[in-house]
């Protein structure tokens, strides 16, 4: 690869790469969201930004009584590996940059994503993306935490340690300063 001349200037290869364009989207079912993602990619979108529904964000099964009326309302419902497979069907994850705006259930959803990538034959070092993984925000802003503050740091740290070692092009946490 070409070496930049000075400072942190990009190489020609980096400079010619198109901007990352991701629409925050996800609704109803994994199948419906997949159709939307593939339409957007066909129109020139260069990455994906997954919006999850409230039961998925808070770790509730879609069949749980507290999930009633919320499944698929503000994002896609993902309850298991089969849902994640449907969400990314015919989307080559090794060629995608995927953002998952998810906090409390970030470790679990990242594991499902990596499972689908593995099934597709994508090497971990080819995957690019971001998990918000900001569990402190869940305590301070939303009240959707699964664990008390101190124990919440353990899964956050686990995602950071794992991705920095095994998935080098993944941004393991994206702190959300825009929340009060």
Language-model features: where?
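Catalytic alpha/beta active-site cores
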Residues: 1-180
């Amino acid at each position: 690869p070409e070496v930049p001349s000075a400072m942190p200037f990009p190489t020609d290869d980096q400079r010619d790469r198109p901007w990352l364009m991701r629409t925050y989207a996800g609704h109803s079912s994994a199948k419906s969201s997949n159709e939307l993602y593939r339409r957007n990619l066909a129109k020139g979108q260069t990455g994906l930004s997954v919006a999850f529904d409230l039961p998925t964000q808070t770790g509730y099964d879609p069949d749980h009584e507290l999930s009633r009326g919320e499944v698929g309302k503000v994002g896609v419902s993902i309850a298991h590996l089969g849902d994640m497979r449907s969400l990314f069907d015919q989307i080559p994850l090794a060629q995608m940059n995927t953002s998952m705006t998810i906090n409390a259930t970030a470790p679990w959803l990242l594991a499902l994503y990596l499972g689908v990538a593995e099934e597709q034959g994508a090497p971990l070092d080819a995957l690019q993306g971001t998990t918000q993984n900001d569990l402190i925000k869940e305590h301070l802003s939303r009240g959707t935490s699964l664990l008390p503050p101190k124990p919440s740091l353990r899964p956050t740290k686990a995602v950071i340690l794992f991705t920095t070692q095994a998935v080098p092009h993944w941004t393991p946490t994206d702190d959300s300063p825009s929340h009060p």
